[in-house]
Amino acid sequence: MEITKNLPYMEMTRNLPYGYAIPTVSDLLMAKPTADVQITLAIIHTFIWFYLINKIFVPIIFWIYHNMKSKQRFLYFNRRLFKKAIGWDIGGDENEQKLAIARIDAAMVQHLVGAMLCFPSGFGFGHFLPAGVATAMACQANLCELGWEIEDTLMRIYEIIFGGERGRKFNPPSLMLTLIAHHTAAWCMAIPINMYYPNCTLQHEGLCILQFGVALNFLCQKYGFTLDVANKRDLIKMKILCTIVFVTVIWTRLFRYTYIGITMLVMAYTDENFLLFKLMLVPTIFLSLFNVIVVKDATKKFLKFWSMDTGTTPKLQRQNTRLLSKIYDMKGSVDHNEVRPLYPEIGSVMDVSKTNSETSFKSG
């Protein structure tokens, strides 16, 4: 692992505020480890990701969710997830549900981009590229994450202040606190890491596995929300998804994360870089607490679905019945083919109707 310690503490602000020098294109592309270049790149990434997330990725994801065959099941489980995880009810309006989910999921595209930028340096493929390019890509990945987090925070604050009731509904305190806890990592570490340790391949690996891991886990989770685990084929798919998530989480959020986090803290402390040590300590603690929750949830789901059998337990039928009833309460109806029946032999179409406060099911 090659590490270059470039600058003393005062170098972080050597050009600011009155001595700011306009960086060259070459300096920007190579993410030169100086304050003027790093701050300029952070601003550039903020504008880039504001446009990409809100003008391109969110509309595309919204369209995908709007045209899903299992849309109602998908929206129901997403709504339940948000309420359970952070106490946020995204409401009963279908369009607002899809928009709220799409705004969160669009960030996974940024995570994938960041992971790809970090991969060559983090996993030893930098020698296949021209000198310095792999390091520059990884530094851009740090700033890519920082830029998204800046635009996300500023946009949500703007919506809370000027967006009226709808803006506050999309950005409740519980969500904002969760995002702030997440965003502290890039806020505190992105620019200092790029300036003090731009060649630290271990940090590049850590960012890569965290961003790729969370994107992969989100994808598996979202696909899992479309499955009916009472169906044998769907249950097999769910077991595979839970295994992928479990293995990914254990490696990226427990074993490798712990090693990289401790090594980075020891490195900064040994170098007597106490400013960076303090900046790294707070987000490391926040992420560690978050990782405990993620590992616990992944383990619980892994054990739950691998011990589950299809079509044999009354509990599954009761769960499916409650799901259909809740969807009926929210929508007033259940569209054909959007929620499949518990047992395949019943048929492929199920209607839900309310009679005398009881739910009756009719096969089509």
Label each residue range with its predicted role.
Residues 2-209, 230-340, 361-364:
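Membrane-helix and juxtamembrane interface regions of eukaryotic multi-pass membrane proteins
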Residues 216-226:
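Juxtamembrane membrane-interface segments at transmembrane alpha-helix termini
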Residues 341, 348-363:
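Intrinsically disordered, low-complexity serine/threonine-rich segments
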